[in-house]
Structure formats: structure tokens, C-alpha cells
Amino acid sequence: MIGFRLFGLRRFAIAAWAALALAVSPLALAQSEADPLEPLNRAIFGFNDALDGAVIKPVAQAYAEHVPAPLRTAIGNFMNNLLEPWSALNNLLQGKPERAVSDVGRFLVNTVLTLGLGDVATEFGLERTGEDLGQTLGVWGFGAGPYLVLPVLGPSSLRDGVGRVTAIVYDPSRKISSGSEFAAFTAVRIVDLRAELLPMDKLIDSAALDRYSFIRNAYLQRRQSLIEDRSSSPTKE
């Protein structure tokens, strides 16, 4: 559950319904064949689910219930703002300088005017693109590789896993904080992301006979569409 933020709540909902509609299609079979590590993945999926149910989801529910919505929005904006330079770099690597400039502009505007707590840049017409290294590698022609479920982080692939590990290593919050501060920052980030995903729980539980396959298919479809559709308008979260 924790890794869904990778492609946005609204987009995950669209991908989830597509996964349900295509559950018995040749595409679903092809995606199943892209999961040679399924026994291991299912074991990690079970671990993640247990951890989520015992710790992360209850904390996220309390967070959503007791923290005012404007403050939660500000926290989410702050997290997203820290990712803008990374998105700009990936746009450059993909040969999209205009989007890179937009990302840098978003970072500067939101940082200067709101310390990253607001998103006035969107009001100025600078839309968030949300690029990552996994998408860059896909644009460069690297295949997704086998589907992976990462401990705590959730659904991924070999290609996206490389991108996510690289992003963690070069996370800017690591450079400006101590080990304990970074751990606290990461915990807040996880809880905030999980709180945003709470509305998706009922959709998945009611629509999926096999939650593992449902989430895998939705993830793979969404990631592929992100790579194929990058010539269109910037991402809107």
C-alpha cells in the first residue's frame, strides 16, 4: 500500500479500474509473465500488508482524523517541493528542457513565497510534472524488468527499483539533517502518504478477488502509461 504515491491517487484509481476490466485479458497474462518472482513477491506483499494493518494504517487514520486538512496539505506540498529539483534533472535527462525549467520555477516560486508549504506555482501556470529516474530509464529504452514488491515501499520493478533506491540515496533531506532527523522526516512522509491512500482501501477490497494481482496490474499499467504519455501535457496530481 505504501508505494502507491509513486503515480498519484487519481491516476491509481483510473489504473485500478482498468486492471479490473482487464483481469482476464491477454494483457493480464502478459503482466503475470512479467512476475517471475511471484512467490517471493507475495511473501513480501504479505509482510507489507501485516505491517500496514498493525502500524502504518492506524497511525495514518489517526493522523487524518486529528491533523487539520490545511496542515496535511501543507505537509504534502512541502514533501513534493523537495522533489522538484529531482524532477527537473530527470526532465533534462529525457531531453525536455522546457519541463525542467518549469520544475525549477515551481521550486523557486513555492520555496520563496511559501517555504514550500503552498503550491502557488500551479496558480501561476507551472504544473507539476513529477518525473523520476524510473521514467527516465524507460524513456531511454530500458525495459521494466521483473515486477518486484519492495519491503515497506510496495510495488515496483527492477527498473523502477533502481530509480527509487537512487532517489533515496540522493534525497535532499539526507543532506540537510542528522540521522535521527532524517528518520523522523521519513516517518512523517510515510504517514502522510498513507493517509492520502486511505480512500483507496475500499476500492481495492471491494473490486479485487486477488489484491496482489490487482495492485500489480494497476501498477504496471500506470507506469507504462507514464512513460508512453510523456509527450503530452505535464502531470497534474
Can you annotate each of these PLM segments?
Residues 54, 59-70, 125, 134:
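Membrane interface segments of multi-pass transport proteins and intramembrane proteases
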Residues 41-46, 65, 73, 89-99, ...:
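Second-shell loop/turn segments in exported
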Residues 81-158:
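Mid-length scaffold segments of soluble, non-membrane domains
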Residues 38-62:
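N-terminal targeting signals for Sec/Tat export/insertion, comprising classic cleavable signal peptides
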Residues 72, 76-78:
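Beta-rich strand-turn-strand
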Residues 2-16:
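Bacterial N-terminal signal peptides that target proteins for export
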Residues 25-26:
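N-terminal signal peptide c-region/cleavage motif recognized by signal peptidases
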Residues 31-32, 135-237:
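A structured, mid-to-C-terminal "fold-capping" secondary-structure block
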